[in-house]
């Protein structure tokens, strides 16, 4: 079993990260933060599927002011994402942000950074120091002859030291790159240099397919070394998909229990049902159930029962009929049209099993 990189404990609103606390799943809204109704609606949807920390862009004073009302209507910690204008960071904290994300390098002078730190210190609000490979300082690019993991880490640690020298260490660090292996190496390096909690993600990962693959490889390699306290799957698309992917990778790595895992066969010439459609329907349906079980969806009654042995429950389709399989044994036969309702019934009564 992997040995976890133990970091300092940091409180973000009603949630603790770091230490031995579970790795928290984070996402970011894609609504206009000023649109309180739309932003709250999206946060509630994300919370329902398992988002545990939410970040909102704060590009204007109007967006900062909207945080007050947003906070009243949500139940998970709210992080304000700030770029360039230190006054927005201060306003976001005054309007209830549980954490702020800044890059001290683009906030401005040392005095402006200190103004932000002073308010954070007064309110005990954690600061996430974020550094991306795309915004690496020219001096570090020249020093390392290009954008490198070493340069990213040095940039982040310089900014952390800047804030620590101001007498504040309630920090979270984020170092990101769209280059997967560079991002992995950077996390390996920084984990040896700091005990501040680390937020892990692959930035600009891409659309659903490419983004999931890149994020799964990158986050998988990082998390499997015990590194990481919060994670985000950055996908170009519906943020709800980010949460599904994040939950799955944590479960796959054995870092989190709970949630129904669906396994399904890849189909072959023996398949006699619309297995692709059925598997997708099952995956959508099981997300409603707070169970810690494995569900198998198989395409034929020949190999289905054997292949579903490792699952807690499964279904296997045939011509006009199908099987319900429980704990590797055929439980009952049902008409094909009743496979999905029969599975739902079994899941609804699983606690009675």
State each model region's role.
Residues 132, 140-287:
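Catalytic alpha/beta core domains of metabolic enzymes, predominantly
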Residues 60-82, 115-127, 187-198, 282-284:
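Alpha-helix-loop-beta-strand connector modules within alpha/beta enzyme cores
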Residues 30, 35-36, 47-70, 101-109, ...:
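Glycine-rich, proline-tolerant flexible connector loops at the mouths of alpha/beta enzymes
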Residues 87-128:
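Hydrophobic or amphipathic alpha-helical targeting/insertion segments
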Residues 20-38, 57, 76-84, 140-153, ...:
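Active-site mouth loops of central-metabolism enzymes
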Residues 23-29, 54-56, 78-82, 100-102, ...:
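Hydrophobic faces of well-ordered beta-strands that scaffold small-molecule active sites
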Residues 96-110, 202, 225-239, 317-330:
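Glycine-rich phosphate-binding active-site loops on the catalytic face of alpha/beta enzymes
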Residues 1-27, 121, 284:
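N-terminal amphipathic alpha-helix/helix-capping segment at the start of soluble metabolic enzymes
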């Amino acid at each position: 079993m992997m040995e976890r990189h133990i970091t300092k404990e940091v409180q973000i609103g009603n949630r603790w990260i770091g230490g031995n606390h579970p790795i928290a799943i984070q996402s970011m809204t894609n609504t206009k933060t000023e649109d309180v109704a739309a932003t709250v609606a999206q946060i509630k949807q994300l919370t329902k599927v398992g988002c545990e920390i939410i970040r909102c862009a704060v590009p204007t004073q109007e967006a900062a002011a909207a945080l007050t009302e947003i906070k009243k209507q949500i139940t998970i910690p709210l992080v304000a994402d700030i770029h360039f204008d230190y006054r927005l960071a201060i306003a976001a904290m005054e309007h209830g942000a549980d954490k702020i994300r800044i890059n001290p390098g683009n906030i401005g002078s040392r005095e402006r950074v200190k103004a932000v730190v002073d308010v954070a210190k007064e309110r005990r609000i954690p600061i996430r120091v974020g550094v991306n490979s795309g915004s690496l300082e020219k001096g570090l690019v020249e020093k390392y002859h290009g954008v490198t993991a070493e340069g990213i880490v040095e940039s982040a640690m310089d900014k952390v030291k800047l804030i620590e020298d101001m007498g504040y260490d309630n920090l979270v660090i984020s170092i990101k790159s769209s280059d997967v292996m560079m991002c992995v190496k950077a996390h390996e390096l920084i984990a040896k240099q700091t005990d501040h909690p680390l937020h892990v993600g692959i930035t600009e990962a891409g659309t659903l397919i490419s983004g999931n693959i890149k994020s799964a490889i990158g986050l998988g390699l990082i998390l499997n070394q015990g590194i990481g306290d919060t994670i985000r799957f950055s996908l170009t698309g519906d943020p709800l998909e980010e949460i599904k992917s994040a939950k799955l990778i944590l479960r796959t790595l054995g870092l989190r229990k709970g949630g129904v895992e669906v396994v399904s066969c890849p189909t072959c010439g023996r398949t006699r049902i619309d297995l692709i459609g059925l598997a997708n329907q099952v995956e959508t349906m099981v997300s409603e159930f707070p169970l810690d079980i494995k569900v198998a969806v198989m395409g034929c009654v020949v190999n289905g029962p054997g292949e579903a042995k490792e699952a807690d429950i499964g279904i296997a389709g045939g011509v006009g009929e199908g099987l319900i399989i429980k704990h590797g044994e055929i439980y009952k036969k049902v008409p094909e049209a009743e496979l999905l309702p029969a599975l739902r019934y079994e899941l609804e009564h699983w606690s009675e099993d």
